[in-house]
Structures are given as structure tokens and as C-alpha cells.
Amino acid sequence: RHPSEIDASWGAQRVKGLSIVAILKDVFGKIFKKKNRKVETSLIEEFKYPKLGPGQLWDVTAAEVEKLGGTIIKNAKVTKVHKNANNMLTSLTYEKDGQEFTMEGDYFISSMPVRDLVGGMNDVPADAARIAAGLPYRDYMTLGVLVPKINLVNKTNIRTVNNIVPDCWVYVQDRNVKLGRFQIYNNWSPYMIKDLEHTVWIGLEYFVNEGDEYWNMTEEEFAKIGVSEMIKLGLIDSPDVVLDVHMEKVKKAYPAYFDTYDEMDKLVAYLSSIENLYCVGRNGQHRYNNIDHSMVTSFETVKNILTGSRDKKNIWSVNTEQEYHETSNNEGNEA
């Protein structure tokens, strides 16, 4: 799909608060070492990161849930959501180990893809069902590549182990490769690297569609392409230096802003009318939120349940402020 087809709200969300003025302020703020300067999200250079990666956060969360008496059913797939005549959810059906199970509930908090949620629900109005069925997604593949070093030189004042470049991730604009971005896991957290002094873990990221030629590749086939593109980009000199590889695939990693997305407001209105259903997270709201905002949608949901609030606008409006074209009035109405 051509980028010109993407709904404008996607760009608004991803560069919110960012402008030429904001970039210049940030540059001069660094030069003059201005303290307590406000930094736009897109320009943030430091952030907190779990010692062993994002998964560690959810491991701790899961342990707390179980400590408080909650039950977590893993490796299961929700296939149906049951609604009664009063437009209230009553139960769901899930599959695990080849068997079907039913679970009843008072509140249903869903982070599953909206398309799947509505597709598995009974008695959905035709228009809402059509919109949900038409929502597109982009899938994701990554190849971890372990090498002794990379050729990128650290030209900054930021100190790193073995003086590797300090970036956590780098976007690739070269049309000669399929690679969209790569990560340097050493810089995310040194605790994730077994031999920090002598190796570098690189994560090659590819944006694909489930079932396409890349998605159907074996790890060996995918590794051959990934390593060859690292050589093209000058990250390494030869496939012989590769010590190890590992492939992962993620379905529906990115909710896409094409097709029926421009009718999303109608679908949100329908989902909000189901009193005990709360849609959260990136796929739950079909919104390209980062992990921070995804968690906030859950915080807002819990707040509503505890206070008995039936208005879900606060949940659906997380990270929707339109600040990307303008600066505030007290900054001279610059744009």
C-alpha cells in the first residue's frame, strides 16, 4: 500500500508535539545545556527500561496477579464472546490444548484485535461488523543476529561499552533493502547480553504481511536475507562473522490506518454501548499507541470500573490530543 493512502490521524499521533520550532528549541537547549527544558516525546533521549527487557515487566505483573488470587490462563485463544439480549457480555469461549472452555464474567477488558473481538461476537449490527472486518493490520518479523562487532563508529560524546554506537534503534531508509529498522540490544540493557565485552546482538526488523513470501520463510532462509542486507548496509563485512541467529514472528503487530479505519468512530460508539466491555491497548483500540499509552488505557479502565463510571471517553481519548501542528498560545502562536 502507498503511504499516501494512510489516514492522516496516524501521522498526527506519531509526531504529536513535533515541529521545526520544537526541534530548534531542543537543539539550542542542548547547546546551552538548558536545565529542565521540556522535551517532545519524539525527541526524548533517555527513558526507563526493564533490566531484562519489556517481558520482565509482564512477568512481574503476572506474579502480582497470581499473588492476589488471580488466575492467568496461558497459551489459549479466545474464539467467541457471548452477548445477551440486554447488550451485556456474559461469557467467552476459548480454546486450549485442542479443547473448548467457557468462562463467565462481570467485566470484560479486551486487548485482542478489534477485528477478532467483533468477529467472534453474536448479534452485532451489520454496519459495525462490516467496519471491524475491514480493519487491516501489518505483521512483523525480526531476526536476532549475534556478531563480534558492528562497523558503525561511535562519533558522539556518549560513552558505550567497546565504543559501539549509542543508538537503541536505527530506521533504515535505503530502498535497496527490505529491512525497515534495526535494534542494538546491547544499548537497551547490558544485562540482556551474555558476553557484553565481545559480542553485539542486533535485531533486524521487517514489516510484512501474514502469508507473504517473507512470512513463509524458514529461519535459515530469513537469516540469509537478513545477513546479506547487513553486509549491504556495511554493518558487517561477511556472513562468516555471524555467531548465531534467531527468528520471531508477530501477527497483527501494527494496526493499519487504511480501508474501513476512517469509519472507526462508528465502531467505537457501538463497542462503548456494551456496558461491561472495555477495549484497551494498541490492538484493542486499533490505534498505533506505544506501550506507555497502551498501559494508560488500562489504568483508565480500572478507574472507571472502581468508580462505576459508564462513560468510556476517557479510555478511548488516551493519546488523541491534536498538538502536532501548533505550539501553545503562550509561545506566540507559532506553527
Locate each region found by the language model.
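General small-molecule cofactor/ligand-binding pocket signal
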Residues: 71-73, 243-246, 278
